[in-house]
């Protein structure tokens, strides 16, 4: 899957002799889900290395700062990255990242935090990999309904209604 994403980003197919330098910046590497995702990503890149595609990856932690993430993208591009994977700190503020990448013709794969549609239309080398937020919300709602039906203890005041439900997401 990783090689397909990288191929999709380029104007040409990646050949076995190409070197792929991937720059990754995450909003917060202390996030458990992101940590696991990065482990899997690195395993996939190691698999590509074993199969003749030379890959290098540099991972940066923005630690919740959009300014830091913007600077990291510049550093990664200046270091020679030919593809960026960005987990945005602020999904509504990717313009500086997009502008720098576009200026240097480095495609961006946004992951897990989807930029707004208007930003995704800024350039034809922007991609998003992740869940459909609306679908995730619907699934959370369906799971909550099923749990309530299966466990009457959830209705604490026994009036047949749930007064308060918290669903978390972006």
Give a label for each model feature.
Residues 8-170:
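A residue-level marker of the well-folded mature domains of exported/periplasmic proteins
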């Amino acid at each position: 899957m990783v090689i397909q994403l990288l191929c999709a980003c380029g104007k040409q197919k990646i050949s076995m002799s190409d070197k792929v330098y991937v720059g990754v910046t995450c909003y917060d590497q202390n996030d458990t889900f992101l940590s696991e995702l990065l482990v899997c990503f690195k395993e996939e890149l190691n698999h590509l290395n074993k199969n003749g595609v030379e890959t290098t990856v540099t991972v940066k932690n923005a630690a919740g700062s959009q300014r830091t993430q913007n600077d990291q993208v510049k550093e990664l591009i200046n270091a020679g990255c030919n593809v960026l994977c960005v987990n945005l700190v602020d999904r509504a503020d990717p313009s500086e990242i997009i502008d720098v990448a576009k200026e240097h013709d480095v495609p961006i794969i946004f992951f897990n935090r989807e930029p707004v549609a208007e930003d995704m239309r800024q350039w034809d080398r922007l991609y998003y990999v992740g869940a459909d937020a609306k679908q995730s919300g619907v699934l959370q709602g369906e799971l909550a309904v099923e749990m309530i039906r299966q466990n009457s203890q959830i209705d604490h005041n026994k009036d047949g209604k749930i007064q308060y439900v918290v669903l978390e997401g972006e």
